[in-house]
Amino acid sequence: EIMNIETILSPHLEKCPQINELDEKKRKQLASIIGFVDETVGIEHLVKCLAEGTSMGGDGVIRCYVGFEPSGKAHIGWKVLALQLRRMIDAGTNVMIFLADWHAWINDKFNGNMEHIQTTARYMEDTFRALLGHPDEGDGAGQLRFVWASTIMDSGDYWARVLRCSKGATLAMVRKTFTIMGR
């Protein structure tokens, strides 16, 4: 076995001693999910979900995501990421790849040409499918799915939420977000 479970989990034990309470199968699943990544956000929650067989969706399916602004050709970094995503799929998580087409447009990728941005997003879908070995697609355990920002933003629910959040936001709150927005 390529992965040494204890080597992967030991850096997280101080922050999350509950890892030691997981049975061997769940420890192996956790090690596959987190792999050798530098940062694992919410490991305590993940361990709790594994221990209890629960999830945020209420169906026991652990979901993770990675997001991209469609902006160019595939490079070796995509393969490195795909190796980890494949381990996550094999460990029974649902992997969502978020294609941030509107974010790319805001940041003037392809000079703000949405048609080029969305062509690149479709290229990314095809590339990741191939890099991941064409896994089953859907919202279930061990499946892959792609979600586009434009699809979410076309939803009436999205705009209702934007308006509710905007109504409660102050100028000071908005200013705090500038550093993470990139503009």
Model-identified regions with their sequence ranges:
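NTP-dependent nucleotidyl-transfer catalytic core
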Residues: 1-183
